[in-house]
Amino acid sequence: MKKVFLMLIVVLLLFSLAWARVGDVVKVIKAPGPCPTGLAFDGRYLWLADSRLDKIFKIDPASGQVVKSFDTPGYHPEGLVWDGKYLWHIDSGERLVYCLDPETGAVLKALESNSDRPRDLAWDGQDLWLTDVRNKTIIRCSPVDGMMIQQFSAPGAEPAGLEFDGKYLWVTDRAMDRIFLVDPATGWCLSSLRSYGPWPAGLAFDGQHLWNVDYENDELYQVKVFDSDIMTLWDEKELELRLVKEFRNYGPGLVTSLDIYLPLPADRDNQKLLGPVEFLQKPAEMITDAWGQKMAHFNYRNLKAPAVVQPGWSVKARIYAVEYFIYPDRVGGLDQIPEDIKKKYLVDGDKYCLNDPFIQGLARKIAGNEKNPYWIARKIYEYLIDHLSYNLKPVGGWNPAPTVLRRGTASCSEYTYSLIALCRALGVPARYVGTVSLRGDEASLDDVFHRWNEIYLPPYGWIPFDANKGDVETPGGRALGIGNVAARYVITTENGGGDKYLWFGYNYGFTWTAEGKCRVSEESYGEWQPLGPKKYQKPLPRK
């Protein structure tokens, strides 16, 4: 019976590992000390520093048992890294980098860190890297004399753990509770994972998994970072959304015809409908546009002043924050993009002007000889952030891409037009999605709306790219505009632009004709209400 039970446990363990996705924790080891900081992997064993005990532990990752330990050379031990022969260690109080004999713990070399507040170390096969929490930077330095070779901004305000996986750096940020993938050549944050614990500290890479030690939980986590399943869901909410398109004729003339088109939300990764879409008025018909978007068509005739119509719909939905982790080297080439996707999402449009010499020249200038779809889109994304600033009407609105890129300001719609134009000009399929957004509280009204791009990256499919959201100073903030959708949207529209119903718009489209002079007004808005029990703020009872 015991053998059967043990076999069942083994089978369940193997099954869980097989179904683990990117970001999943596949193993947890209890730290041997109360204040774990730095972490390293030597090809067989983990090494862990503890800042209260002033010790470095050698740990068997298979069993979690301590193999040996020795005292640290200083009294504020933090970062660790293995260079293939020696253990390097950083002391944040002394601000020194030590090269240690892994057998005895003896100091073989001590270097000035050239950092105000060093925290962790990485080794790229030639040079050392370290995080400087006070200056919010990542520093590359010489293992010979400690002198700085390169420096760039850290992902956020609290850089902690650091590791090199053979191509990219990994950096934890304790304020953002994230682990960022960073390009050491540019300093760009490429993607990120939410940390499993609340205080992500040291990092180590074992060739397949990333190890992260959590300073608050006193645990070591083995994290899966390579898998075909790159999506995770977070922050579930259940809400009801009511979308209304209001049209008024104040006269004195007659509105002879009015056609309103309302695209309908459907199940997507970030949203699951809890029931059918319900209409405030019965539509004249249901139609599907050239992009496959389903929508309701409302038709009105001879609206005499004063007249008002308010077609719309409501839906109950479960919405999520959705995150896709993109490791650039695992993205396929342009030749791996399906032909039907290319045929549909590489076409020109009035807002894109793909054949404009300005668009063609700028696209080539930005991308150079790059062939990886991720890097093409990412370079364009960074260009838009560096050269555009957010500005709505009267300066901006829905101008075509060449106008926007020359002007240097953009609405969210114009960010999307510009990214679509430059990506399509280089053979990367791009489209946009339109949404109704929560504005602050879950009971709120949205009359501004929002849209962003989706870029086709093989083999994963459509990945969100929101250059408007990513237009911030911190590298980590920029990364959150790619592959991340917050739990505050219902996506109504999935479109390539230029169809006869929505044109290059989203959430609604409308046309009207009139006889005589007519003063008309129109507005669109989404009303949100949370589902479930009411919420109250109550003080704690006195004991």
What are these regions (language model features)?
Residues 60-64, 101-105, 142-146, 183-187, ...:
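Short loop/turn segments that connect beta-strands within beta-propeller blades
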Residues 225-323:
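Intrinsically disordered, low-complexity N-terminal segments that are enriched in acidic
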Residues 31-42, 73-83, 114-125, 155-166, ...:
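Beta-rich, blade/repeat-based domains predominating
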